[in-house]
C-alpha cells in the first residue's frame, strides 16, 4: 500500500500509518479529529517521527504530500502552528506547562489546527501533568495535542483516558534493512 509522503520516514509501522491516515482523511472531510493523541513505543520505534508526520499531514492541503511549504515547515520544526515541546531539564515543570497551555490556546496562523507536539510527556511533574490535564479536558476547538511517551502507563490515567492511543513497535529487522538499502546505506 502506498502511504502519504509525510509518513515516509516511518519504517515498519504500516498499521500505525493506516490509523493516522484515516484520521487525517476524516479531519480533511470536515468530520474533525480527536483533540489528544498519545504516541507510545520503545526508543527507536519512531513515536516522535510519527507524531511529527501526523502534524504535517493534518496541516497539509494534500493530507501529507511531503512537498508543500507546510510539510517542509513541519519537517524543519519551524511551522508556526506546531509547538514542538521538549523538557527544559530532566522534567517538565508546571511553569513550562502552563506557558505551553496558554500558547496552545491561540489561533493557528497558517493552517486549520494549532498542534502541540509534547515529546517525552512522561517526564512531566505531577503539577505539570495536572496543568496539562486541564487543557486536554477543556481543549480549544482548533488545538490538537500529540503526546509522546515510551509506555501509556507512564502518564496518569486521567490523561491517558482522554487520548487516542497510537502504539508503535520496534520495527522488524528486515523492514529496517529494506529502508537502509533504499537509502543507499
Where are these regions (language model features)?
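Conserved catalytic/switch belt of AAA+ P-loop NTPases
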Residues: 105, 130-147
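Sensor-1/coupling segment of RecA-like P-loop NTPase cores
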Residues: 124, 139-156
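Structural signal for conserved beta-strand scaffold positions within catalytic alpha/beta enzyme cores
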Residues: 84-86, 147, 165-167
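P-loop/Walker A NTP-binding region and its immediately flanking N-terminal helices
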Residues: 1-120, 127, 144
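Conserved AAA+ ATPase core "coupling" helix
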Residues: 156-185
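A short beta-strand-to-loop transition that corresponds to the Sensor-1 phosphate-sensing loop
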Residues: 119-120, 147-152, 170-172
Amino acid at each position: 500500500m502506498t502511504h502519504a509522503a509525510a509518513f515516509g520516514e516511518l519504517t515498519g509501522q504500516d498499521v500505525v500509518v493506516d490509523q493516522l491516515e484515516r484520521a487525517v482523511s476524516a479531519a480533511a472531510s470536515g468530520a474533525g479529529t480527536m483533540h489528544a493523541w498519545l504516541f507510545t513505543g520503545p526508543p527507536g520505534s519512531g513515536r516522535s517521527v510519527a507524531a511529527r508526520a501526523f502534524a504535517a499531514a493534518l496541516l497539509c492541503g494534500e493530507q501529507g504530500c511531503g512537498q508543500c511549504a507546510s510539510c517542509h515547515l513541519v519537517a524543519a520544526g519551524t511551522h508556526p502552528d506546531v509547538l514542538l515541546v521538549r523538557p527544559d531539564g530532566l522534567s517538565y515543570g508546571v511553569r513550562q506547562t502552563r506557558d505551553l497551555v496558554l500558547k496552545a490556546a491561540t489561533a493557528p496562523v497558517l493552517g486549520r489546527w494549532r498542534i502541540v507536539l509534547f515529546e517525552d510527556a512522561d517526564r512531566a511533574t505531577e503539577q505539570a501533568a495536572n496543568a496539562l490535564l486541564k487543557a486536554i479536558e477543556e481543549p480549544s476547538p482548533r488545538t490538537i495535542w500529540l503526546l509522546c511517551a515510551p509506555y501509556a502507563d507512564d502518564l496518569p490515567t486521567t490523561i491517558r483516558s482522554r487520548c487516542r492511543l497510537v502504539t508503535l513497535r520496534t520495527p522488524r529487522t528486515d523492514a529496517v534493512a529494506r529502508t537502509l538499502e533504499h537509502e543507499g546505506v
